């Protein structure tokens, strides 16, 4: 059972020196550092410091990696307002008939009825109304831009990859580097960052060892940009995100001879969300999920996790704490800072094996 501190947002604060925030990815991808969490019977001092390539020694034949195959859209676009001036839109999600929810900057200068010209084109957009739930704007795009697949060609012409605000760089290489090697289904506005560590060489080596790969889809959306502001975490609610867990994934998990390992928190949310919406049993599912995973949660599917280092007081920190324990996780973060690990999207990774998770929180 979680203690009272586990249920307070302030308990998930930690100090991160700014120089520990990764501003660029390492090359090759698998050369990122890997903090290996100790088993629950060991002290924090037993953590090991390796490279992502060393997952080859940690994973076994018969294990199954579940990855998120979402592809990041070039969703940040510049528009010229009819009254003059340039604004920025972050295109988030479709609302039907060519209408899209967008975050606007500066928002106060974008009013219902405003006409916008997509920078570098003659394409006209119209601001329809404000979205009260998000503070964003519903914007009318051309009618054929009805979903992520159909708007992607337009965004590829004039958009930019929406790197997180803590990354201060503009590099054309991000269009490729801020995608996983297996990114396939367009729709995200942020990358599932744990997957960025897998190079083609590492994926091939894991396959050669007998490690399986299954693909879910979770389009990382507005929730990524929303800080948790609820101090009492028993009252926490999260923004919904669209997922697909298809029949082939369910079958692969049912037939898995080893351990089910989630690559990233998005894979955890998809698998666990699909299960919890269907009585705790994993079945094929397509639709929105807003599952809150925090200490006290009992996992229905996931047994281990590869993850990046997350922002203080974030929902992702709560999720990882549910698996390994808040105090242990924060101690490992302190060790990572002392050892000069690189944090956040382009940063290093942590491996939480099934031996390292809290007793009784994952399926056998």
Curated annotation (Swiss-Prot):
Keyword Membrane included in the entry's annotation: no
Catalytic reactions on record: 7-aminomethyl-7-carbaguanosine(34) in tRNA + S-adenosyl-L-methionine = epoxyqueuosine(34) in tRNA + adenine + L-methionine + 2 H(+)
GO MF annotation list: S-adenosylmethionine:tRNA ribosyltransferase-isomerase activity
One Pfam match: Queuosine_synth
Keyword Cytoplasm: yes
GO BP terms, alphabetized: queuosine biosynthetic process; tRNA wobble guanine modification
Cell compartments where the protein resides: Cytoplasm
GO annotation, cellular component aspect: cytoplasm
Pathway: tRNA modification; tRNA-queuosine biosynthesis
Keywords, alphabetical: Cytoplasm, Queuosine biosynthesis, S-adenosyl-L-methionine, Transferase
Domain of life: Bacteria
EC number: 2.4.99.17
Subunit record text: Monomer.
Protein family: Belongs to the QueA family.
Role played: Transfers and isomerizes the ribose moiety from AdoMet to the 7-aminomethyl group of 7-deazaguanine (preQ1-tRNA) to give epoxyqueuosine (oQ-tRNA).
Protein name, UniProt field: S-adenosylmethionine:tRNA ribosyltransferase-isomerase
Organism expressing this protein natively: Synechococcus sp. (strain CC9902)
Source species taxonomy: Bacteria, Bacillati, Cyanobacteriota, Cyanophyceae, Synechococcales
């Amino acid at each position: 059972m979680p203690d009272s501190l586990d249920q307070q947002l302030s308990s998930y604060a930690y100090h991160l020196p700014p120089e520990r925030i990764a501003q660029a990815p390492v090359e090759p991808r698998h050369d990122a550092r890997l903090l290996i969490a100790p088993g629950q019977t060991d002290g924090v001092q037993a953590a090991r410091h390796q490279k992502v390539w060393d997952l080859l020694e940690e994973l076994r034949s018969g294990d199954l990696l579940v990855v998120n195959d979402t592809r990041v859209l070039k969703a940040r676009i510049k528009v010229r307002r009819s009254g003059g001036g340039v604004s920025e839109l972050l295109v988030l999600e479709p609302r039907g008939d060519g209408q899209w929810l967008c975050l606007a900057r500066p928002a106060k200068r974008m009013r219902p009825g405003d006409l916008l010209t997509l920078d570098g084109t003659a394409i006209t957009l119209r601001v329809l109304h404000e979205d009260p739930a998000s503070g964003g704007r519903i914007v009318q795009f051309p009618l054929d831009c009805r979903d992520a697949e159909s708007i992607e060609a337009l965004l590829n012409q004039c958009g930019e990859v929406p790197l997180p605000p803590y990354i201060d760089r503009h590099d054309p290489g991000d269009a490729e580097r801020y995608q996983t090697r297996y990114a396939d289904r367009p729709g995200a506005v942020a990358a599932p960052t744990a997957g960025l560590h897998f190079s083609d060489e590492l994926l091939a080596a894991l396959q050669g060892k007998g490690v399986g790969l299954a693909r879910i889809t979770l389009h990382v959306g507005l929730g990524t940009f929303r800080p948790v502001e609820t101090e009492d975490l028993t009252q926490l609610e999260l923004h919904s995100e669209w997922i697909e867990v298809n029949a082939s994934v369910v079958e692969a998990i049912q037939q898995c001879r080893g351990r089910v390992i989630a690559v990233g928190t998005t894979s955890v949310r998809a698998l666990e969300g699909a299960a919890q919406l269907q009585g705790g049993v994993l079945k094929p599912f397509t639709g929105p999920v807003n599952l809150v995973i925090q200490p006290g949660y009992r996992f229905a599917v996931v047994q281990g996790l590869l993850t990046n280092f997350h922002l203080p007081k974030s929902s992702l920190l709560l999720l990882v704490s549910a698996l390994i324990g808040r105090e242990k996780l924060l101690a490992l973060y302190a060790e990572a800072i002392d050892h000069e690990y690189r944090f956040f999207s382009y940063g290093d990774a942590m491996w939480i094996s099934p031996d390292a998770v809290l007793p009784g929180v994952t399926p056998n």
